[in-house]
Amino acid sequence: MHGQALIDRLGDRLAGLRGRLTPNAEMDKITWFRAGGLAEVFFQPADEEDLAAFLRAVPEEIPLTIVGVGSNLLVRDGGIPGFVIRLSAKGFGEAEIVSPIRIKAGAATPDKRVAALALEAGIGGFHFYHGIPGAIGGALRMNAGANGVETRERVVEVRALDRKGNVQTMSNAEMGYAYRHSAAPVGLIFTSAVFEGFAEDKATIKAAMDAVQNHRETVQPIREKTGGSTFKNPEGTSAWKEIDKAGCRGLMIGGAQMSPMHCNFMINTGTATGYDLEYLGETVRARVLEHSGIRLQWEIKRIGNFRPGHAVQEFLGQLL
């Protein structure tokens, strides 16, 4: 990676930015897997105005990648070309009550913070965020959900910037939500959203949040280096059941393992590379495909380039 060369190449275009530019940033420091390569340049904008100025300054042929807190992210060992953008909590992490049943939250606001704010205000419908270890931007992009509730059930309006730095607002319908998916254009960077719940007794909300936390601690390896659920649930079944039936519980490749505690959670046991993790995931997909004919779909977002000679084929090249 030649991050400083990219910064120098753009020169005066970036001179007025107030955010931080870091060349050759180590992505394994921010992803929950603690694995992966470098970002050519890592940019943390100071606020929405600074982000808009950055987007207007950077030529469109230079790739941009937006990341959140790194909880659902696998970075490949060859690194990420161009700029990687991460919204800071200082500039994009505020959350507030804007009506008796509505919450406005910045894209860098932790999901857990929204759940806690809803509890304080007696707003029901947000308890599921207590069990999602990400931030609002990622929840909006992938329609994050847990315990039978999804983000799309709470979204009223989303604010974003397009590749040219222009503000765009989208309604719930315009987000095009489906299971763990949004049809919003990939180039949009979400900056905030308004959510709506319903009036509910605080004791009831607290009980629901406690149940979410107890469930996580009982069945999920939350103290491991993990990206959360590895694969989406196929229609009519659960990913973990199919993984288990294919004999992949506890399966290990290098330092990567399918958790013995919850076999849809992939973990870094300490020495895993991005290659180990992705190769393990594709091995599981291949074995499930062979065993049941089901093509598991990744829920974890994989970004960046493979290290030369270490590309990983989907299903390890197995096509049935």
From Swiss-Prot:
It is an enzyme of class 1 (oxidoreductase). GO terms for molecular function: FAD binding; UDP-N-acetylmuramate dehydrogenase activity. The gene is murB. One of its GO terms (biological process) is cell division. It catalyses: UDP-N-acetyl-alpha-D-muramate + NADP(+) = UDP-N-acetyl-3-O-(1-carboxyvinyl)-alpha-D-glucosamine + NADPH + H(+). Its cofactor is FAD. Cell wall formation. SUPFAM superfamilies: FAD-binding/transporter-associated domain-like (SSF56176), Uridine diphospho-N-Acetylenolpyruvylglucosamine reductase, MurB, C-terminal domain (SSF56194). Its EC number is 1.3.1.98. GO terms for cellular component: cytosol. NCBIfam families: murB, PRK13905.1. This is UDP-N-acetylenolpyruvoylglucosamine reductase. Residues 34-200 form the FAD-binding PCMH-type domain.
